[in-house]
Amino acid sequence: MKVVVDNSILKFKELIPHLSDLKDIDFYHLHTEEIINNSIKDAEILFVRSTLKINADLINNTKIKFVGSATAGFDHIDVKYLENNNINWCYSPGCNSSSVVHYVISSINFLIEKKLFNLNDCVGIVGYGNIGSKLRKALNKVGIKNICYDPFLKLEHLKNFDEIKQCKLLSFHVPL
């Protein structure tokens, strides 16, 4: 079996030696720009990042049976095409959520240092999924007031939109 892996997926090469039972699998590591229809003709599995568009132009007339994306989103994947062609796929929701939370907390710290935000101000969190819920926990741990809003979830602590508009800082964690 031939597996094509985007070179930009960190640590993938380090994982392969630990898969000793996979002797009949050949891994080919290509740079993103090298992953084109002709270079994956004989591959059955494809692992990518969000910089590569997964669509008919790439997959047509190949042996691809599975596409795995090492990214939190899947807007680079033509899901209908894959499903219509019985190609399984997956992505990695939440894989970068901790990094995003750290970034937001660091940004708030920067704003505090510049006296643009203080600990008595309130942060509004729009979207209460993987990232929004982790951000709320982190803000609570450091004692920063916050209000969450997510119109798709009916949880008690998710306030109405009018209340969140009063926050000094808004952090959006919603699909684009």
Name what the model sees in each region.
Residues 41-42, 63, 165-166:
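Alpha-helix C-terminal capping/helix-to-coil transition sites in glycosyltransferase folds
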